[in-house]
């Protein structure tokens, strides 16, 4: 079974591709049945389907698919999910076994309907800009914002809010001069107060009335702050060009007064009044931490350091709990109205992403960490948000909902990904809760072709009524979203997997160890948000030991007899590198960095997630000038090679000692050493290819053996050779790693002993 081919067609990978037939047998497989699903998986071969889907009767509402039984003579179909009989609509009167509509063809198990009813409002982009920055940083941000106006569709609505000590809401409909409404940054305003001060309706205005109001040239209140780009581009560009750093004086021993929380509160209040239940992005550009008003993460006094993991663990971070409550309250409001929040940081210090993470993670917003708005990491990442497809449509999707239907043998445990629960109960909701559980429907305010969700299942069948023979379980994913072309799209994916008895080799052979590693990594990262780090590591180890006890071949109490089949051989090393990854190890990372890493793990597909868990390493040498994959191990560090490390977040080129000396001597500039010049260039060419579709842009590092930046490589290598390892004559190896971490070899040795031990 080629898992990657299935992923290309349907955007889905299951941990097990043959399901155990009973609940008890399923619990014994240790790794839960889970699908890593990419709803907007790019399928250039999908033909446009410009009509409403045929659905089953309520409450089922499953969509017609290739697994339905069709009676072409009597013109009815039987739903495989509820077994109800449904008549085909009149337009299907000419259907026959040789002339089937596209949704019934086996190769179109994934199909996308373009629905005839358009959204009432075009997508909205509200820029929330921090002006507490130095002039160079602010100028770079202004330039990027002006460029972005040309990347957005001209009919999109845009707005501008700036903040420092005060918050300014700009009235783009006023063209005589730059006009803004000013709010005090230290005050906690209610939604009603903000809407009244801005002259906005305090109750949800109907989208139809809003559309009519927009026809007036700025006379209607809702249209003053959010206007189509084609109507306000000149005015907005002028305002951006005139923005100046915050003029409020800052003492030498103080931080600037930055009211990020108040600015976000005002932005959310404005959006929920002007464009409720409509697609949109609130894009926060923060140049530092919030220091005043609601959502403060650190005081203005420089003698008070911003919180660390150590402070949070010891309950010594005095602002954290209050800030978390505030931002989680904003998250509930913004997600209820279908708006995503993007957080783009341009600061060497932390800005409070740990406190604000729910705003992005629960709404499907983007997170970008950069040292400054002048860096290419920010500039290129920001522009990639507005990327286009082959038809010149923005890749962004808005205000999506996903419903998962299953046949009666399966129930849903939950979802882990960038979504919020719609709290919709149905008969296929299971008892076990993993992630966002107790529902079969979720909302994703922001969604893109890269957005990936882990959905967890349980087998509902008791042993007495186990499925017989060639029975199979069906799962249907229904994703409704607002497309950037201002149409509603419904993406439908229907997949089937067979059931087998618990001891069947079919189950073992169907294990997708890569998808399983990612599914378990998401659970571990989810647990790490609420549990202590050591507890999560112990849980990860327990699950691995149990899996090996169940599926390995061994003799009791004989570690040398331990064998794993080819379907399981990579899984233990994935778990080893997961234990050492920044998702579970917070040492040497700030709370903001940890929040960012976990956010990205919950967004990317299987292949990219595996790069995050176990980075890839390539070696370039005179024997292999084109580069070859090598072990992520200390033995790969040699003086005469160049290494290229890809951790997803960093791309690092590491020059061995000898290569670095030759380069520093300038040999590559001499004609007779052309091969050295080509060798030095080869990793850079490979790195450029890795950057083509990566988001956000990774940090690019070039270093030499023994240099300070080499720590980024050494920290991710398996420490098979450390300062405690002796080579010839008792001396440590030349490339020893100074660490007390256990090596992969020691880890596997302990795993074998524990797995074969008599319980």
Swiss-Prot record:
Keyword Zinc recorded: yes
Pfam families, sorted: Gelsolin, Sec23_BS, Sec23_helical, Sec23_trunk, zf-Sec23_Sec24
Molecular functions (GO terms): GTPase activator activity; zinc ion binding
Major location (coarse): cytoplasm
InterPro entries: ADF-H/Gelsolin-like_dom_sf, Gelsolin-like_dom, Gelsolin-like_dom_sf, Sec23, Sec23/24_helical_dom, Sec23/24_helical_dom_sf, Sec23/24_trunk_dom, Sec23_24_beta_S
Record's keyword terms, sorted: Cytoplasm, Cytoplasmic vesicle, Endoplasmic reticulum, ER-Golgi transport, Golgi apparatus, Membrane, Metal-binding, Protein transport, Transport, Zinc
Binding annotation for Zn(2+): 56, 60, 79, 82
Its membrane topology: Peripheral membrane protein
GO cellular component: COPII vesicle coat; endoplasmic reticulum exit site; endoplasmic reticulum membrane; Golgi membrane
Subcellular compartments: Cytoplasm; Cytoplasmic vesicle, COPII-coated vesicle membrane; Endoplasmic reticulum membrane; Golgi apparatus membrane
KW Protein transport (keyword) present: yes
Subunit architecture: The COPII coat is composed of at least 5 proteins: the sec23/24 complex, the sec13/31 complex, and the protein sar1.
Protein function: Component of the coat protein complex II (COPII) which promotes the formation of transport vesicles from the endoplasmic reticulum (ER). The coat has two main functions, the physical deformation of the endoplasmic reticulum membrane into vesicles and the selection of cargo molecules.
UniProt similarity note: Belongs to the SEC23/SEC24 family. SEC23 subfamily.
Stated name of the protein: Protein transport protein sec23-1
Organism: Schizosaccharomyces pombe (strain 972 / ATCC 24843) (Fission yeast)
Lineage, opening ranks: Eukaryota, Fungi, Dikarya, Ascomycota, Taphrinomycotina
